Curated annotation (Swiss-Prot):
Official protein name in the record: tRNA pseudouridine synthase A
Family in the record: Belongs to the tRNA pseudouridine synthase TruA family.
Gene3D superfamilies for the chain: Pseudouridine synthase I, catalytic domain, C-terminal subdomain, Pseudouridine synthase I, catalytic domain, N-terminal subdomain
Active site, per annotation: 52 (nucleophile)
CDD domains documented for this protein: PseudoU_synth_EcTruA
Alphabetic keyword roster: Isomerase, tRNA processing
InterPro entries reported in the protein's UniProt record: PsdUridine_synth_cat_dom_sf, PsdUridine_synth_TruA, PsdUridine_synth_TruA_a/b_dom, PsdUridine_synth_TruA_C, TruA/RsuA/RluB/E/F_N
Name of the coding gene: truA
Pfam families documented for this protein: PseudoU_synth_1
Length: 246
């Protein structure tokens, strides 16, 4: 039995998240079905993390154990022949030690969020982006983003259903940058709570749109009160960009 690591990318628009669900289409479900067609036996995959319904991935990491005699390049081609029509693509395959786990060995994760901030755009440019009508002040947004850097209790920005024992997370980078008609928010952290990134984004945007003080964001973060967080930003504009390992 060989452990294989796969770098994958996907459009999460039509899926009910990564984690398998019995009656709904998921990323894990589609990949495991594709592996079963090739392996002729059930294959369970493990991931670096579970993206929510509608969230995309530029580079997600998964592993699986398989016991068939096939070259990795041919396995990649066979999987993509099945998966590409379902908006999932295998970018890379390689063998890993049996002790490796994509989630528990991960050191950091990077997410990005696309905000369409222009009135002059084509309809398709709003796909995989969150449209904000008001012209946003990147300087204000970045001042709020700096507040996130370091180790904090993110209870305020956690989902009520999140069962994590600790709500503390370490944020290494958080910044906004202009890219044409878009404003991109990038964040790197040790890991993230369920819907944490979208809750942070939604709160920062609401404060900026309403011209509230930047200190309001810090007060909300330190409150550890979920009820003070603003509307959670839509999932369609969120991407898992990269997972970091030693």
């Amino acid at each position: 039995m060989k452990k294989i690591l796969a770098e994958i990318t996907y459009d999460g628009s039509i899926y009910h998240g990564f984690q398998i669900q019995p009656t709904k289409p998921t990323i894990q479900g589609e990949i495991e079905k594709a592996l079963m067609k090739i392996n002729k036996k059930k294959v369970k995959i493990h991931s670096s993390g579970r993206t929510d319904k509608g969230v995309h991935a530029k580079k997600q990491i998964i592993t699986f154990d398989i016991n068939i005699n096939i070259q990795l390049n041919n396995l990649k081609k066979a999987l993509n022949a099945i998966l590409l029509k379902n908006s999932i693509k295998i970018l890379k395959l390689k063998y890993m030690k049996n002790s490796f786990h994509p989630r528990f060995n991960a050191q950091k994760r990077k997410y990005s969020y696309r905000i369409l901030n222009s009135n002059n755009y084509y309809p398709w440019e709003g796909y995989q982006a969150h449209y904000v009508n008001k012209k946003l002040n990147i300087s204000n947004l970045n001042q709020m983003a700096k507040i996130l850097i370091g180790n904090h209790d993110f209870t305020t920005f956690s989902c009520i259903k999140d069962k994590s024992k600790s709500k503390f997370r370490h944020i290494y980078l958080a910044k906004f940058k202009k890219r044409g008609k878009y404003i991109i928010f990038e964040i790197i952290g040790s890991s993230f709570l369920w819907k944490m990134v979208r809750s942070i984004i939604g709160t920062m945007l609401d404060i900026e749109i309403k011209n509230e003080s930047i200190s309001t964001f810090e007060t909300i973060l330190k409150s550890k009160n979920r009820n003070l967080a603003r509307t959670t930003a839509p999932a369609n504009a969120l991407f898992l960009d990269k997972v970091y390992y030693e």
